């Protein structure tokens, strides 16, 4: 597997990438704006993509803006698989008995927190109180990488 080949010391994930990162076992996890509820919302709404024109409309509405990471293509087949993906991630949570290190950063101005896609309450339910709120948005601004994320990486990896 790629884990055996690369032997990562740490995994970092942001937004939906945090859900992917949580599924990786045996390494510390640093997560930024983890969208823990997104797989379940997308999975429940997948039927909308069967309506002609909806996939195209959502692709236009949610096209990556400057600074966004990558496109999410809203097809039925893609969206319906998200529920299993979310369940697999949460099965690897602290609440489910995993003793990996998990830490999350949440921006106070994260527009996805208003929708429930990103939820501190969901984080606390599955991972406890190992998180930090910071004055930022959904995508971590550079200054927060330097003053919050990097120091935690150094601490987790015991780099002096």
Residue ranges of each PLM-predicted region?
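The alpha/beta-hydrolase serine catalytic core
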Residues: 28-159
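Detector for methionine-enriched segments
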Residues: 3, 16, 132-133
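Active-site catalytic motif of lipid deacylating hydrolases and related acyltransferases
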Residues: 1-5, 138
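Gly/Ala-rich beta-loop-alpha elbow adjacent to hydrolase catalytic centers
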Residues: 11-22
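Solvent-exposed polar/charged
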Residues: 4, 22-23, 125
């Amino acid at each position: 597997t790629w884990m055996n080949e690369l032997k990562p010391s740490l995994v970092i994930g942001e937004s939906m990438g945090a859900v992917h990162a949580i599924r990786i076992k045996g390494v510390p996890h640093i997560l930024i704006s983890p969208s823990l509820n997104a797989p379940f919302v997308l999975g429940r709404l997948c039927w909308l993509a069967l309506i002609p024109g909806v996939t195209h409309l959502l692709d236009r509405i949610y096209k990556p803006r400057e600074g966004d990471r990558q496109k999410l293509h809203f097809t039925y087949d893609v969206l319906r698989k998200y529920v299993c993906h979310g369940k697999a991630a949460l099965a690897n949570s602290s609440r489910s008995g995993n003793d990996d290190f998990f830490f999350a950063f949440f921006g106070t101005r994260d527009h996805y927190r208003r929708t429930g896609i990103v939820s501190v309450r969901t984080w606390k339910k599955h991972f406890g109180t190992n998180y930090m709120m910071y004055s930022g948005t959904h995508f971590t601004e550079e200054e927060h990488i330097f003053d919050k994320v990097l120091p935690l990486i150094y601490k987790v990896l015991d780099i002096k």
